[in-house]
């Protein structure tokens, strides 16, 4: 049987796994699903229409699955989905999607969202990411995998932060962040490769050296994006398949990438 504190308020339409823990003064609303071994420590509110996976930790005063902060929202049935093995620290707010953009906000697995992080409506967040204290993620943002966003940073709506990148603290991101890059500042500017992140993943020196070449081609050579893509595909992709991440970043960007 689920470990539910007697002060918790649980909707009759909520589904809670028998191994989950619901702490003191938590509220679990209508049509909420909570998976195995997930813990709501205390004073956590899961408003409604939210699916939560396994082995997640939610800390006090986090607000999960609240209505989107969008003037177009008119009470439609929209959802928040959260995967497995995430840690959601104190006072985080994660909002559901809007009907205009598919009706879903989605957070993957193995993410750490530190104190007071906000994830707005219709965001898509992948796996193995760290969003530090007071990060604000506006609506319709896509965050890939293995990304660190420094504290007090803001990400403009519709931006994409691509895999293995690093956003420095107190950064204002107004354009897309290409894979592997480090950006910081207000507004954000590119400052090199996330080499330390690559080393922590155990990537070889040879791989990193080829990615350094790719960075110089895209950000320091003076070539147009079209010209840089040709060099990446013809000269560097045969040497290192990870170049595909960078090529994909450049090809799919709608806002232009941070340079």
From Swiss-Prot:
What does the subunit section of this Swiss-Prot or TrEMBL entry state?
Homotrimer.
Reactions mediated catalytically: a (3R)-hydroxyacyl-[ACP] + UDP-N-acetyl-alpha-D-glucosamine = a UDP-3-O-[(3R)-3-hydroxyacyl]-N-acetyl-alpha-D-glucosamine + holo-[ACP]
* Record localization: Cytoplasm
Organism listed in the record:
Psychrobacter arcticus (strain DSM 17307 / VKM B-2377 / 273-4)
What does the protein in this record do? Involved in the biosynthesis of lipid A, a phosphorylated glycolipid that anchors the lipopolysaccharide to the outer membrane of the cell.
Kindly state one GO CC term assigned in the UniProt record.
cytoplasm
GO molecular function terms here?
A: acyl-[acyl-carrier-protein]-UDP-N-acetylglucosamine O-acyltransferase activity
Q: What is this protein called?
A: Acyl-[acyl-carrier-protein]--UDP-N-acetylglucosamine O-acyltransferase
